[in-house]
């Protein structure tokens, strides 16, 4: 074949090497840790992603998780449904997002989209991304953070939007979580391996942060004995941030269009993954 459209299946070196006519791989999504990049590079194959399709859906999902945790959605919902309405004054208090500090770690399309939505909530927005200039971040209403570790104790919410690679694997560990504010909400809708799940579970059990929202896991699906599945301070979803009707439609169209555009020499550079 000359082109492959792929979602979550593994595209190994063996498969890529055996596809002698393969010229382009179009990923149904923006992550590509399921594709052997070295083999892709060695075989001079172009890797494209649906760069413009999923930002709105993922940014909305991040806010959904942020609100759900801040407002203790699970607990308050269960209180009403189990006939304990009168216990409302005894429940742990919720928190507001207005005027709170949020750190967006990774400032690609999703991070930029999230910033716009957080501005509507009148949050104070900080951005960590070594590859984006202070001027560009300031232009859209954010404040650039140069040292991730030093900023953690000032943030009320942290949302991860980085790729998973050797530099970001287990970037968020126990020591880093210990530096966060006790009322901090940690959200990951990027890639599971960026957060050390064992460390996160320990930190949640020790009440080091307010709560965590995960749409992604180190192992998917997570095993049933993963303690985060039973942790009341963890708000979880099944890697479903993009599963809106609108987003899936956009992604499907863009995946195919990327292949067509490649062979028509019209594929946008912003949709091509630069493999170093």
Task: Show where each model-derived region lies.
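An N-terminal-biased, well-structured beta-alpha scaffold segment characteristic
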Residues: 1-48, 153, 173
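Phosphate-coordination loops involved in phosphoryl transfer and adenosine-cofactor binding
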Residues: 22, 98-101, 174, 183
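Rossmann-like dinucleotide-binding domain for NAD(H)/NADP(H)
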Residues: 47, 183-276
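Glycine-rich Rossmann-fold phosphate-binding loop(s) that bind the pyrophosphate
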Residues: 107-108
């Amino acid at each position: 074949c000359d082109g492959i459209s792929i979602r979550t299946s593994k595209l190994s070196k063996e498969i890529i090497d055996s596809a002698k006519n393969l010229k382009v791989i179009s990923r149904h999504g923006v992550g590509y840790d399921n594709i052997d990049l070295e083999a892709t590079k060695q075989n001079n194959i172009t890797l494209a992603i649906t760069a413009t399709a999923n930002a709105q859906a993922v940014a909305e999902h991040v806010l959904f998780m942020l609100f759900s945790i801040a407002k203790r959605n699970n607990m308050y919902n269960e209180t009403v449904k189990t006939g304990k309405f009168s216990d409302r004054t005894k429940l742990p208090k919720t928190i507001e997002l207005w005027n709170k500090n949020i750190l967006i770690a990774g400032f690609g399309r999703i991070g930029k989209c999230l910033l716009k939505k957080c501005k509507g909530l009148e949050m104070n927005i900080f951005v960590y991304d070594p590859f984006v200039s202070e001027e560009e971040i300031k232009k859209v209403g954010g404040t650039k953070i140069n040292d991730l570790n030093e900023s953690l104790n000032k943030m009320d919410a942290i949302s991860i939007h980085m790729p998973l690679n050797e530099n970001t694997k287990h970037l968020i560990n126990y020591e880093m979580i210990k530096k966060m504010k006790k009322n901090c909400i940690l959200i990951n809708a990027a890639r599971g391996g960026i957060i050390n799940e064992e460390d996160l579970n320990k930190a949640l059990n020790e009440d080091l942060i307010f709560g965590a929202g995960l749409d992604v896991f180190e192992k998917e699906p997570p095993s049933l004995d993963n303690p985060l599945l039973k942790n009341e301070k963890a708000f979880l979803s099944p890697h479903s941030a993009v599963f809106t009707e609108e987003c899936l439609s956009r992604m499907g169209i863009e995946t195919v269009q990327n292949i067509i555009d490649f062979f028509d020499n019209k594929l946008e550079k912003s949709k091509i993954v630069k493999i170093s």
